[in-house]
Amino acid sequence: MINIMEVTETNKMVEKENLDVRTITMGINLLDCAGPDLAEVNEKIYNKITTLAKDLVSTGEEIAKEFGVPIVNKRISITPISLVGSSACKTPEDYVTIAKTLDKAAHTVGVNFIGGYSAVVSKGMTKSDELLIRSIPQALAQTELICSSVNVGSTKTGINMDAVRLMGEIVKETAELTKDKDSLGCAKLVVLCNAPDDNPFMAGAFHGVTEDDAIINVGVSGPGVVKYALESVRGKSFEVLCETIKKTAFKITRVGQLVAQEASKRLGVPFGIIDLSLAPTPAVGDSVAEILEEIGLERAGAPGTTAALAMLNDQVKKGGVMASSYVGGLSGAFIPVSEDQGMIDAVNEGSLTIEKLEAMTCVCSVGLDMIAIPGDTPATTISGIIADEAAIGMVNQKTTAVRVIPVVGKGVGETVEFGGLLGYAPIMPVNKFDCSAFVNRVGRIPAPIHSFKN
């Protein structure tokens, strides 16, 4: 039974503690738009998206107004475009025409982003996969709202090192083609291992082939709420700490469940999942790093950080699972550097390095996220970073990802400003030693022994 105290508590979460629904994401299947004629494919894609998602933004705004809960983003995820364009696209430029169509459709319906300019190449690359991947730099340079992702490995298949090597080059090329905007294109490009089919968060969202024709997935955000709750239990035992996080996560997720069901009902689209992720913003008091400091660390990155993050992640899941009928996506704590003021402060004070962030990715939601690195970082070094993250995901049976921005013309000690939810970031140093002889081997890294479950 809900009592009046809980109602006022939820109001306080929204008013003072930065509780919001980070995104309502509509997943749309575009496989029925495939065909041999490129102009026809583009027309079908545009028509399907603008028909199914025409009321997405207005519905989100109505729900936000009625329930008093801010809904920050309305987004679309689509079937990986390497599949949709495989018959019609013969060159990377052909795929870029689809990117422009998607961008136009996204502008027409008014969403913040559209994700799914993607390829799933966990074991091998088809010709169309490779064409799409090679088109990514142009696509991101010539569009505004497109997000791109490439899945290069999984626990079941191992790591496709040919794709990893290629993605290092693609990240560099994307940085170069968007250098007039501080290499912003790379902020909309993520390389994943074990990518989920139902992720509502960008840039890794795509509508997997296992999904319904259309679906509503919701991502909730509440680092500020968790931090405020923990302020009242300073110095208490781990048991009290864990219970507090769990109860808070339950309340946050309940808000997401309410919004998801309402959006599903009004749009006439089935409800998919709630993503339990704690997603920070650059706003002060809306930071995962500040939660870790409230738990007892002087700064994020201090000894004990990985343990504190593991505990936070686990309790968020335990609390959230009870509050929703379906949980999915990434569901954990995000640790993006540029989007989290506490992380930025930790980097500036020398407490947090890329190596420590990599350790933290073993126990949190995704991976090395929104990290600005020197523009002269070699492509093979970026591939090495991607391979390391993919290995963590593959062996630990979890989603991992890399979204690094090699900012052209900038080096360690400088800062890059992305604006909005993407925030700003200090350029972080990268290990200078070479890994090209490793990265340039062809083939794939086999799946781990514990992946054989049959």
Swiss-Prot record:
The record's InterPro entries line, in alphabetical order, gives:
UPF0210
For this protein, the record's Pfam families field holds:
DUF711 (PF05167)
Q: Which Gene3D superfamilies match?
A: 3.20.70.20
The domain of life for this entry's organism is Bacteria
SUPFAM superfamilies attached here?
A: PFL-like glycyl radical enzymes
Tell me the subunit arrangement: Homodimer.
Stored NCBIfam families: PRK05313.1
Family per UniProt?
Answer: Belongs to the UPF0210 family.
Q: What name does the UniProt record give this protein?
A: UPF0210 protein EUBELI_01067
